Amino acid sequence: MKIIQEIPEKNIIKVMPENLDDLWHLSHIVQAYNAVYSVTERRTEDKGDKLRADRGTKRRVFLGIKVEKVSFHEEVNRLRVSGKIIHAPEDIPIGSYHTLDIEPFTQISIQKNWKKWDLTRLKEAEESGKRPKVVVVILDDSEADIFTVRDFGVKELASIKSGVSKRIDSKQNEQAKYLYYNEIITTLSEFDGKILFAGPGFSKNNIQNYISEKHKDLASKIVIESTNHTGRLGLSEILKSGIIDRIYGEARLSKESQIIEKLLEEISKKRLASYGLNSVKNSINYSAVETLLITDEFLRRNRSTVEEMVNSVENSGGKFVVISTEHDSGRQLKALGGISALLRFPVE
């Protein structure tokens, strides 16, 4: 995310999303009753051409809308923001409806009553854009699953079968193994930065040796880590281990996975954790909350309540973290009521 301009006296911040993660962040920043301004395409009627019976001509105009609906479309790399027009050229009626299609590198200005979590998310998005993409390959002798770890969740890029089998002879297995390695390497060729190979056994080490011999340009990017499982279970191990933070710098999804893992440990010990709205409020009243954990969904539904709780937590020296429900750890927090807290001391 690029923060282009801040106009505090008007509560306006002008930004430019640079990737899909940024659009996702904006989908949680922009909400109903905010004003959003951007250059967009709008179909306008050509009043001078009475003979034409079509729907008019599309042209690029600068519009402002009062937001009514926000929808994030991962599959088409787009954020759609709909509402009534509040600013437009003279020939476009104020109060008519329009949808802004916001894509990467679309500049928009957002006018709203900025909350702490909005500004925190905006700064996180700005920092996230400076880090390389996180690519993880979880593999064994039979299959490789390749993932990119985004701020809002995990996307599976490919699942590649090796073709190695006990039913074929050793020569055929050797050929199948190298085809397997090369298919993995081809999938990874478009990515810059470090690539994490992980899994049980020696497959990760074997492909590292092959790459070191045949693809020296790629060899320097590889990091090896062991897991007990393959597939998404193996990826979950990686996210909770902290290895991604050590390689790439602090990644949002890894950070969230680790903090929810710590929460669940404390809940199992029945000590330094509380969950559910009433229990967390009680912990806040005792100034016991070290870290307040809230899902993005809970925040959307309870903004005024959350704002009051965040202020109380920060006044007592605590902090808050908003957790995405787009990944497993966020869904675990959602199952606990969408709100929990790590505590400084136990509260009865």
Swiss-Prot record:
GO terms for molecular function: endonuclease activity; metal ion binding. It is an enzyme of class 3 (hydrolase). PANTHER family: PELOTA (PTHR10853), PROTEIN PELOTA HOMOLOG (PTHR10853:SF0). Keywords: Cytoplasm, Endonuclease, Hydrolase, Metal-binding, Nuclease. May function in recognizing stalled ribosomes, interact with stem-loop structures in stalled mRNA molecules, and effect endonucleolytic cleavage of the mRNA. May play a role in the release non-functional ribosomes and degradation of damaged mRNAs. Has endoribonuclease activity. Its cofactor is a divalent metal cation. Monomer. Its main location: cytoplasm. It is found in: Cytoplasm. This is Protein pelota homolog. GO terms for biological process: nonfunctional rRNA decay; nuclear-transcribed mRNA catabolic process, no-go decay; nuclear-transcribed mRNA catabolic process, non-stop decay; ribosome disassembly; RNA surveillance. It holds the Pfam family eRF1_3. It comes from the Archaea. InterPro entries: eFR1_2_sf (IPR042226), eRF1_1_Pelota (IPR005140), eRF1_3 (IPR005142), Pelota/DOM34_N (IPR038069), Pelota_arc (IPR023521), Ribosomal_eL30-like_sf (IPR029064), Transl-rel_pelota (IPR004405). The N-terminal domain has the RNA-binding Sm fold. It harbors the endoribonuclease activity. It comes from Methanococcus vannielii (strain ATCC 35089 / DSM 1224 / JCM 13029 / OCM 148 / SB). HAMAP family: PelO. The keyword Metal-binding applies. Belongs to the eukaryotic release factor 1 family. Pelota subfamily. GO terms for cellular component: cytoplasm. The keyword 4Fe-4S does not apply. Its EC number is 3.1.-.-.
